[in-house]
Amino acid sequence: MSSKMIRVQRLHSILISGLNLSCKTRHRSSHNTQLFRFQFDPSAKLGLDIASCLLTRAPNGQNAEGKTKYVIRPYTPISDPDAKGYFDLMIKVYPEGKMSQHFASLKPGDVVEVKGPIEKLRYKPNMKKHIGMIAGGTGITPMLQVIEAILKNPDDNTQVSLLYANVSPDDILLKKKLDVLAASHPNLKIFYTVDNPTNDWTGGKGYISKDMAVKGLPEPGDDTLILVCGPPGMMKQISGDKAKDYSQGELTGILKELGYTESMVYKF
């Protein structure tokens, strides 16, 4: 794959075969999360469908035959798909995470192999009257894509309710941006909860509970969709994880107990 900038209007089709894209900047978002900006032709836009993700690939040693091994991980950009010349990835860095450690070693000018897109939810304006979201940690990234698509479209009347769980107040990613969006858009409601609250914390305390879901999400119904994205423990508690073949899998957990059906829930 070439590291040269490709002069096209949309990178979408070219990404299918893969590109090496240069890291322009990196910033600390929290104690274990960093924001990376990757650049390409400034006249082009990424052009991904809403909530689609990209695959990133990095070398990871050699196999018994001396050939390079690779680690591959999906990430959802948090930047506007129509932004020209760049996209942003928010990466949580795990001590044993092979790909996240690779990202943590990047310096401006270094390149990352990117391929995709992988389409997730096929969002259409007004596809549901009310969308509820349950996110944990970096599980906020696909939610932000959907939220911004709804809010920037004056013809989209969808009501959005977000329950966002984190370990501590300092771990809440993109909180300032989310708060600004909620303050300026009455169709967006957000409830934060943390495991380890500070003395001045006024939001929820503990894991997302059945009571939080009842109070913060739209009721089950044909015009309701609940989106879920977070770490495995949260997924198990809320909805059950996806199947081994990455299909949606059986709906279990709190959402099933509250009467939601598989057609009302989408797991990222």
Range-by-range predicted roles:
Residues 116-128:
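A short, basic/flexible loop-to-alpha-helix module at the beginning of a structural domain
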Residues 163-268:
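Reductase modules of NAD(P)H-dependent flavoproteins
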Residues 7-110, 166-168, 195-196:
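Ferredoxin-reductase
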Residues 142-154:
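Histidine-anchored nucleotide/phosphate-binding helix
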Residues 130-132, 161, 225:
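Structural motif
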Residues 138-143, 234:
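Hydrophobic/small residue at the entry helix of a nucleotide-binding pocket
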Residues 51, 139, 231:
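Short, conserved phosphate/pyrophosphate- and ester-handling motifs at nucleotide-, phospho-/glycolipid
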